[in-house]
Regions:
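Glycine-centered small-residue hotspots that permit tight backbone geometry or close packing
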Residues: 1-2, 158
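Short, surface-exposed loop or secondary-structure junction motifs
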Residues: 15-235
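Short, glycine/proline-biased beta-turn/loop segments that scaffold the active-site neighborhood
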Residues: 2-15, 123-124
């Protein structure tokens, strides 16, 4: 938790992101911007960044019959690394969670969706939680996410509503996870039971306690977890 981001992501070396602490990123106090409107930056060049048909270059599916140039994913990461750091006070940041996905993938050696599927969802018997449900489920059983009138210009069903997550292939650390209430409930029950589900341990109790505890007196955040305000207010 006290390691620098550069320990895991070589691409940050030589930038001011190299020395960001993992703990500060998980508590949203690293100084990273709240978000960057990546999709808006592509709209002036829409014909060169998006295509209605998939090929080796345009293979990142952001919506039905809409594919993004694969190379644009690198542009997203570069924009994050080049963005100025701001105040280290608490402010939720999509960018922190986007980079945390890369950390998980570096450590595990597999993509975030594969890691979660193999480590939790499949062994727990959860069949209706995961990323990009349009790939694995009947679209008629998925509630539409939104009508996107600005970016993808269609009703989204089975595709993440967050534009940045869509541009990252529907799998991101900050958005993209779909679930039924039942499967989400089973996952939360595992956490409530100290990391055990149906007799099998998935997480250490001390890990859950550490990550779900307040970390600083000036922020309600745990490590990756949001928590009630110190005043007791929940909204």
């Amino acid at each position: 938790l006290n390691a620098n981001l550069g320990r895991y992501l070589g691409m940050t070396r030589g930038t001011d992101k190299e020395f960001l602490k993992i703990k500060d990123m998980l508590t949203h106090q690293s100084g990273l911007k709240a978000w960057i409107p990546f999709y808006k930056e592509t709209l002036p060049y829409i014909d060169s960044v998006y295509c209605a048909k998939s090929d080796s270059a345009f293979c990142v599916k952001v919506a039905d019959k809409l594919f993004m140039l694969k190379a644009n994913k690198d542009t997203i990461y570069k924009r994050i690394f080049d963005s100025p750091l701001e105040s280290r006070t608490y402010r939720y940041s999509d960018l922190s969670m986007i980079l945390m996905q890369l950390v998980v993938e570096k450590i595990s050696g597999v993509s975030l969706d594969t890691f979660m599927q193999d480590s939790f969802y499949s062994p727990m018997g959860l069949k209706d939680i995961g990323y990009n449900p349009w790939k694995h489920h009947d679209i008629n059983n998925i509630a539409p996410t939104q009508v996107d009138r600005l970016f993808r210009k269609q009703e989204l069903c089975g595709y993440v509503h967050d534009p940045a997550a869509a541009m990252l292939g529907g799998v991101s650390g900050h958005a993209g996870l779909f679930s039924t209430v039942q499967d989400l409930g089973f996952l939360m029950q595992m956490l409530a039971d100290g990391g055990v589900y149906e007799g099998k341990r998935y997480l250490k109790l001390e890990t859950i306690q550490k990550f779900t505890s307040y970390q600083r007196s000036d922020s309600r955040r745990g490590l990756g977890f949001d928590k009630p305000d110190f005043s007791g207010k929940t909204s």
